[in-house]
C-alpha cells in the first residue's frame, strides 16, 4: 500500500532528530543512512512499474488517487449502506477494534497510553535537559517510532477522506506496530502487577490468553478474514460486511454439487443473489464438476440461488437480489 512509504519518511525524520541531538551521530551514521535511503527508493522504483515513466509525478498522482479514489459503490457499515467515498471518519478505527481480539485491544490501549505518556513527559522536559533528547534510550525511540507509524496512516485517511471498503484491509501494514504496542502494554502491565500477584499466576494467565488466541487461529482457518471479536461476533452480519472476498463461497458450491448429485442432474444452474463473482470460486474447488452454469444475478428459473449477504447497494431496493419466499433454504 502507498501509505507504507511513511516508513522511510519516519526513518529520515528520526535520523534528523538524532543528528540535532548529537552532531557526531551524523558523522558516524551518514553513510549507512544514505545507503538505506537510496536502496529504498531504488527498489521502490524497480518493483513499481507505474513509476518507470515519470517517477515523481506518478508517485504524487498515486497519493491523490488514493485519497480521492472513485469506487462508486456503497459499503454496509453500522447497519446502513453508505457511499464508500463518504464514510464516517471512524470507519477504520471501528473495524480495527471489532476485528482484533479483546485481549489485544486491552493491552494495546495500555501500551499506547503508556508510550504516549512517556512521549509527552519527554517533550515537557526538553528545555530542562542538557542534551535536549526526545527519547532517553533506544527502546523509547522504537516506542515512539511505532506509535507514529500506527497513528499517521489512520490520521491521513481521516484527513484526506480516503475511499475505504472491505474493512481496514487498506491499513493492514500498520498491524506490526499495533502488535508492538500490545507488547509494550503487556510489559507495563507486568511491571505494575508483579508486586501484587505471584509470577506463577501471571504466567498462567498469559498462557491461557495464548491458548485462547491459538484456538481461534485454528478454529477460523482458513477464514480468518471473517473473524470478529466477542464484542460484536453474534451481531456482526447486522451491522457490517462479512466476507468481502467471498473466500467461503467455494464451500457453498461444493454443497450444491453434492446435493445435486443426489438427483443425478446433468447440469446445475446457480443464480447469485449477492455482489460476488461466484464463478471465480470454482478455481479453488475440492470437487471437480463440469456441469455448473452460473447465471449471475439474472432471474431464469435457477435450480439454486446463492447469497453470501454481501451487497454494493441496499438489497431491499434491488430486484436482482430478491429471493422468492418459497425458496428452500440450506
Question: Which positions does each model-derived feature cover?
Answer:
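Active-site catalytic pocket residues across diverse enzymes, especially alpha/beta-hydrolases
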Residues: 16, 20, 177, 189-193, ...
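Short loop/turn segments at secondary-structure transitions that flank enzyme active sites
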Residues: 112, 179, 311
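Catalytic lumenal/periplasmic loop and adjoining terminal transmembrane helix
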Residues: 49-53, 58-65, 162-164, 197-330
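Short intrinsically disordered, low-complexity coil segments enriched in acidic
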Residues: 1-17, 42, 106, 113, ...
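Surface-exposed alpha-helical interface segments used for non-catalytic interactions
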Residues: 10-11, 149, 171, 254
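Transmembrane-lumen/periplasm boundary regions of multi-pass, lipid-linked membrane glycan transferases
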Residues: 12-146, 152-164, 208-251
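Cytosolic-side transmembrane helix boundary signature
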Residues: 19-25, 181-202
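Hydrophobic/aromatic-rich transmembrane helices and adjacent perimembrane loops
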Residues: 1-7, 94-108, 155, 165-190
Amino acid at each position: 500500500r502507498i501509505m507504507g512509504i511513511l516508513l522511510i519518511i519516519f526513518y529520515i525524520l528520526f535520523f534528523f532528530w538524532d543528528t540535532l541531538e548529537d552532531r557526531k551521530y551524523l558523522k558516524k551514521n551518514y553513510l549507512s543512512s544514505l545507503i538505506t535511503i537510496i536502496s529504498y527508493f531504488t527498489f521502490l522504483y524497480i518493483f513499481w512499474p507505474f513509476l518507470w515513466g515519470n517517477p515523481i509525478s506518478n508517485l504524487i498522482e498515486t497519493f491523490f488517487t488514493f485519497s480521492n479514489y472513485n469506487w462508486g459503490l456503497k459499503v454496509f457499515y453500522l447497519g446502513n449502506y453508505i457511499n464508500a467515498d463518504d464514510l464516517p471518519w471512524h470507519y477504520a478505527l471501528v473495524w480495527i477494534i471489532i476485528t482484533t481480539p479483546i485481549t489485544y485491544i486491552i493491552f494495546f490501549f495500555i501500551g499506547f497510553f503508556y508510550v504516549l505518556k512517556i512521549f509527552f513527559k519527554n517533550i515537557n522536559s526538553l528545555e530542562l535537559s542538557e542534551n535536549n533528547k526526545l527519547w532517553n534510550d533506544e527502546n523509547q525511540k522504537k516506542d515512539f517510532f511505532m506509535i507514529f507509524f500506527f497513528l499517521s496512516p489512520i490520521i491521513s485517511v481521516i484527513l484526506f477522506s480516503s475511499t475505504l471498503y472491505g474493512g481496514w484491509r487498506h491499513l493492514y501494514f500498520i498491524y506490526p506496530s499495533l502488535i508492538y504496542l500490545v507488547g509494550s502494554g503487556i510489559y507495563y502491565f507486568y511491571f505494575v502487577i508483579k508486586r501484587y500477584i505471584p509470577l506463577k499466576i501471571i504466567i498462567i494467565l498469559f498462557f491461557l490468553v495464548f491458548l485462547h488466541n491459538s484456538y481461534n487461529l485454528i478454529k477460523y482457518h482458513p477464514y480468518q478474514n471473517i473473524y470478529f471479536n466477542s464484542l460484536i461476533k453474534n451481531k456482526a452480519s447486522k451491522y457490517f460486511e462479512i466476507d468481502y472476498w467471498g473466500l467461503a463461497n467455494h464451500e457453498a458450491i461444493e454443497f450444491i454439487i453434492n446435493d445435486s448429485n443426489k438427483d443425478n442432474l446433468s447440469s446445475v444452474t446457480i443464480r447469485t443473489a449477492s455482489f460476488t463473482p461466484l464463478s471465480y470460486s470454482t478455481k479453488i474447488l475440492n470437487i471437480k464438476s463440469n456441469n455448473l452454469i452460473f447465471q449471475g444475478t439474472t432471474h431464469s428459473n435457477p435450480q439454486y440461488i446463492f447469497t453470501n449477504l454481501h451487497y454494493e447497494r441496499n438489497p431491499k431496493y434491488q430486484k436482482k437480489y430478491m429471493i422468492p419466499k418459497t425458496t428452500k433454504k440450506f
